[in-house]
Amino acid sequence: MPANSALRRITKKALYSLLGDSSYKYFQAASKAMDIRNGSWSEPELELIPFAIRPGETALDLGANFGLYSYHISRALGAAGRVYAFEPVPFTFETLQLVAKILRFKNVTRFEKGCGEKAGKISFEVPVQASGAFAAGQAYIGGRRDDREGKETQVRWASTREVVCEVIRLDDFLPEINELSLIKCDIEGAELFAFRGARKLIGKHLPTVICEINPWFLEGFGVRLEELTAFFFDQDYRLYHYRSQDGESALVPVETRDVVEDNYVFIHPQRLSRFASILVGGA
């Protein structure tokens, strides 16, 4: 059954109504683990992982959700490598733990925490689907202004549930990690806050950063797109968009003005050689 088929959505709604939160997570974990393993849940940028990292290095998965990126990064890093995965929402984290058990994550350290500019307890809003189940991948830090122009296309839920989660600063929480080569970040508009809290780590290691960028969500936090890209441009990073179609793959340079809602890749010149075979314009 495809990962987002109509039949599957109907099945999930029925099961959630029958099982409720506490038991539904077992079904959710089993189905997500199957999707991850067989590739029916995927993103094009997963193809960049073998370019970005080497066995034995370290990676961060911010907004780990149910472990899609953690799984693929873990396999590429090998037994000597390490993934640190952060997922603050309790239901999602519990499901991630089950997925990790099913898929036998060996080198993924998981934390029930979010990442931000300041440490503390923070309210998150978790969208609720028509079935009553959480839309876990769309949870966001409270305070984002969604009741504004553009809501019709960006807000795909009728209600949210508030949960209080712990947020840490990565510079304080993981000051001694070695060989940080990749950060994946997808936290629904709060990406710049996480990066500011990891300023020292990023400046020291200059990791490749795979980041979802949604300008509308950024604006909801009072952040301009230019502020996000400038954080990296000020450290000499370059911005790319990954295109993969009909067997052809390419990393294409992008200007800030051309950014729309999608995944993007920030790469420092020191790491460009790793991507030389797919870089448009060369390293």
Each language-model region and where it sits:
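Phosphate/nucleotide-binding beta-alpha loop and adjacent structural elements of enzyme active sites
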Residues: M1-A283
